[in-house]
């Protein structure tokens, strides 16, 4: 006659807790970025920032980036296709689906674009105003040390990238809807 022990098996809860604590900030290696620290302590509620769609913002940053018109056109073409065009940072920008894009060729004398990607917009704020507000918010939180000049230059993009990494956002180094929401600007 064999007797079996009727001891209850308990999971080792301490081990799983220690394991997740050890791996929470583990470094990931990638071909493009040599050392990116993943911050698993921050949770982003995607439903919380989808309210931008109500204000005319219809697409994500990746879709906006793919919609940039890369051909040069004269100002008549730009005005026939887009109703809102503004001068910003040495060049002209057009508004489309909640994003500001560089309008190459609008005026050949003003085609100096420091940044050539989309800038998320809200309401009727110009790209200059949006960028200046982001610079001001990043400076208040210790991420940006340059002048509040409304230019999305390398210093501003670097500060945005550090902020996005520290807050668990998608790292785009650009002004996008999630970053504006987390900064409390929209």
Describe every region a protein language model picked out.
Residues 173-179:
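Short glycine/proline-centered loop/turn elements that form peptide/ligand docking sites
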Residues 186:
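Extracytoplasmic/periplasmic copper-protein system
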């Amino acid at each position: 006659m064999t007797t079996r022990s009727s001891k209850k098996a308990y999971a080792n809860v301490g081990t799983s807790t220690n394991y997740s604590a050890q791996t929470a900030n583990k470094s990931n290696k990638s071909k493009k970025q040599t050392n990116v620290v993943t911050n698993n302590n921050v949770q982003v509620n995607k439903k919380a920032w989808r309210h931008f769609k109500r204000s005319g913002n219809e697409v994500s940053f990746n879709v906006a980036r793919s919609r940039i018109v890369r051909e040069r056109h004269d100002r008549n073409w730009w005005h026939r296709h887009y109703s809102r065009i503004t001068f910003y940072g040495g060049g002209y920008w057009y508004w489309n689906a909640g994003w500001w894009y560089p309008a190459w060729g609008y005026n050949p004398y003003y085609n100096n674009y420091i940044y050539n990607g989309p800038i998320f917009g809200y309401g009727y704020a110009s790209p200059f105003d949006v960028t200046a507000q982001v610079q001001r918010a990043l400076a208040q939180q210790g991420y940006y040390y340059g002048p509040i000049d409304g230019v999305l230059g390398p210093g501003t993009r670097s500060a945005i990238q550090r902020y996005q990494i520290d807050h668990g956002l998608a790292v785009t180094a650009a002004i996008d809807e999630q970053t504006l929401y987390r900064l409390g600007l929209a």
